Amino acid sequence: MLRLLALFLHCLPLVSGDYDICKSWVTTDEGPTWEFYACQPKVMRLKDYVKVKVEPSGITCGDPPERFCSHENPYLCSNECDASNPDLAHPPRLMFDREDEGLATYWQSVTWSRYPSPLEANITLSWNKSVELTDDVVVTFEYGRPTVMVLEKSLDNGRTWQPYQFYAEDCMEAFGMSARRARDMSPSSAHRVLCTEEYSRWAGSKKEKHVRFEVRDRFAIFAGPDLRNMDNLYTRMESAKGLKEFFTFTDLRMRLLRPALGGTYVQRENLYKYFYAISNIEVIGRCKCNLHANLCTVREGSLQCECEHNTTGPDCGRCKKNFRTRAWRAGSYLPLPHGSPNACAAAGSAFGSQTKPPTMAPLGDSSFWPQVSSSAEAVAISVAVPSQAKDSTLFELKPRSPQVIPIEEFQDCECYGHSNRCSYIDFLNVVTCVSCKHNTRGQHCQHCRLGYYRNGSAELDDENVCIECNCNQIGSVHDRCNETGFCECREGAVGPKCDDCLPTHYWRQGCYPNVCDDDQLLCQNGGTCQQNQRCACPPGYTGIRCEQPRCDLADDAGPDCDRAPGIVPRPDTLLGCLLLLGLAARLAC
């Protein structure tokens, strides 16, 4: 009976598929043991576990009460938003509630009554944990979709942000980018950030409501239109750099930059029809457990993986104590169909089960100790001792080669899972980690390498404890940043990565002072400022800001040039000539 049960458990992963089994009990020549497989949690509606934040304060309508109109009938403004009345209030929670059939509930912003000041809103969705997208993100807007919007993501619980996708009715005008569609991207560019015009152009507030972040279109590049070739998708997830991470985040943020305009320009006489209204946000995905768990549950108010393979942490991102014989690694989808678990292991165990530790070899037996394989590594772990001068009366140091020893043999060696080897330098009485990984450095791999900074939301033994600074090469002084991830910017550059400019500067392969603007550096004599870089002067004027009349051209002289038919010299020119003639006459005498 036990043999039949073991056979059933062994065959179960073969028929279940989709990486949903983490381990099975098998019988081997050495006896029964666990066999591990790469595994992942089931797909779920992530919006059921999200925390939402709407900024700035006061952007939600109803305090004070406010009336608003629709684009279809802008002069019938009988609708009202009142936060004190439950029937008329539109709080943020209505973006995630379950709606009765035929009755839409929605969050709504204030109207654009303060035009021309921008009407902008940030909607941040936080899970306090890494999650992975498996389907499109779909945002449903009532009363029209925004004409300009940015979707951003964070990998560190909202400390830093990066663009995910740009949306605009004119991508070139709004962001200086050409419009593209996800379905038209190549396999090598499937994880690139793009700007789309598909979801921003006016088509009626009731006809087109949805704005999408297209995950399925990107998957289809590898798995086919019907997503039937998932084996190819899983293979590319492992082989294509950055593809798997592209669908991973801890937070999403929608930056609503300009509301629906009804297909026209802003009409100042009726600003009560311009606002944002969102009735639903659908996010389909799963907990990111690094292929070390098939369950994800809510604990202490947050999603957490139920880790297998002797791993631990919210994302199964580190090895359990006493299972750190080798450095932690994420599981892999390859080889198909069950992948590689890359389980953490105790000393002497192939799969991570606790076994009897190996017998210690005598210190003189060099075959027990792993050998340093490269000269570069040897330099990194040894200390050179200078030769003693003949007339020295101090003391003599007898250099000895440092011993590189497996980590489990050192009680004082803690590398936080970033190395599995230590070196003991006896004449310094120092135990230090060797070959720190995951962009760490230091005696215990406790510091980040230059060009990286500490991830405050990760434990010290997390693989993602160090985040790359990613400083803009042109806008920053160097590639290093401070402990919060902010880079040191050159003059005129701003932003965490120095990839933006002060309002007094413009970007052109670096930040340069504005030549003109619409505030203080005005173009004169009817000139127009073009992208803060130059003034386009009308006929008859020249200069940096069109301040100089062009008196040198008879057919193109400005009104400040005194001229008549035949180009009569100006009075001040005649006076100068007379003075010169008088001076010449005196000298001749």
Swiss-Prot record:
Disulfide bonds join 22-39, 61-81, 69-77, 171-195, 287-296, 289-305, 307-316, 319-344, 413-422, 415-433, 436-445, 448-466, 469-481, 471-487, 489-498, 501-511, 516-529, 523-535, 537-546. Residues 1-17 form the signal peptide. A lipid is attached at residue 566 (GPI-anchor amidated glycine). The keyword Thylakoid does not apply. N-glycosylated. Residues 264-267 are annotated as: NGL discriminant loop III. Residues 567-589 form a propeptide. One of its GO terms (biological process) is postsynaptic specialization assembly. Expression is restricted primarily to neurons of the CNS, particularly in the cerebral cortex, habenular nucleus and superior colliculus. Low levels in lung, kidney, heart and spleen. Involved in controlling patterning and neuronal circuit formation at the laminar, cellular, subcellular and synaptic levels. Promotes neurite outgrowth of both axons and dendrites. The laminin N-terminal domain mediates 1:1 binding to NGL ligand with sub-micromolar affinity. Three NGL-binding loops mediate discrimination for LRRC4/NGL2 among other NGLs by binding specifically to its LRR repeats. This specificity drives the sorting of a mixed population of molecules into discrete cell surface subdomains. Interacts with LRRC4. This is Netrin-G2. It comes from Mus musculus.
